[in-house]
Amino acid sequence: MTLKVIDVSAHNGTILWKNVKGRVDAAILRAGYRGYGSAGTLAEDKRFRANAANANALNIPIGAYWLSQALNEREAEEEVAYLVKLLKPFRIAYPVYLDSEYCEQNANGRGDRISKVQRTKNALTFLKAVAAAGYTAGLYCAENWFTAEIDGEAIRKAGYTIWCARLAGKPRIGDHDAWQYTWKARVSGIPGDVDMSEFYRDFARGGADAATKPTTGARKSLDTIAAEVLAGKWGNGADRKKQLAAAGYDYAAVQKKVNALIRR
């Protein structure tokens, strides 16, 4: 299964979403960012609310990403608290990603020169908080960043979905659920170039492809279901609750187990 997914921000200008509909399978929207200056001010993407509202109105599945410049775990938690408030009014079917990359051309952003160990701690804190808020959490980064600047393998082993950018060909990082392969796609309704990715899991339909989608045949343990929830295989929010109930699982018990796993 391969899905066409764009990612957009205020830099893409005013988007005519009615023209976009039917040309892509989903969109990942920049919700906001922490400024890369010393103040580190939290900010909302100027087009996020309009993009999210218009995509929701047309039933175009959306996810979100947040560009982090957190210096420590406390700031990572602060970023998620701000982010979740932005997301709450909207239907978020696709993952909520931590965008980990240099934020200033010469790597002089406030968070650009923290250690790999600290950046990984920040990322794990961020993603745990996103998952605790009921969203599928994931990491976005470039292929070289996955090993050089962050411990991508530790994040993958923790059960978070991976979205990797590589313009020269498919990422060589092992398992990943999405590949951003160009920054210069063209889609009707979007002025100029737009980022395009291939996604290999349909998060809008429970977060798994046909080979891995949860089934209702065999009864699974609470630990197994909770792990699948963290891996994004049961969707988000109300959709997750509906799917778990339809499969005969106690949503409250599963969510309690998920929260316990996150706190480990």
Where do the PLM segments sit?
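Functionally critical loop-and-helix segments that line ligand-binding/catalytic clefts
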Residues: 1-18, 153-218
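Extracytoplasmic Gram-positive cell-surface binding/anchoring modules and repeats
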Residues: 230-241, 249-251
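Repeat-associated, polar segments at repeat-unit boundaries in modular proteins
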Residues: 247-264
